[in-house]
Amino acid sequence: MPQEVKERQVQALTAHFAKLPAQDNRETILIDAGLVSMQLMLTARAHGYDTNPIGGYEKENMAEVFGIEKERYVPVMLLSIGKSVDEGYASYRFPIDKITQWK
């Protein structure tokens, strides 16, 4: 990306997100972070690593534990990456026709 395009994009996006309500920005952050997390997990798997997304943790303590700015960063999930010791097992999934309505 040429530098001038980058600068124009950053300026436009900064102005756009500054106008949005905090909740709208938070929802955008959560969606984007979920997509980035998914891509990281797929990339790790492609390189022979296993991953485990973790959502059950004390989000209010994350900034202090990791030494990051609480007002700037939104905790989304913890993600462990490594080599598994044991083979995983398949979990049950409902058939799509049991959980989806097509209208």
What is the predicted function of each stretch?
Residues 1-103:
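Acidic, surface-exposed loops and disordered segments
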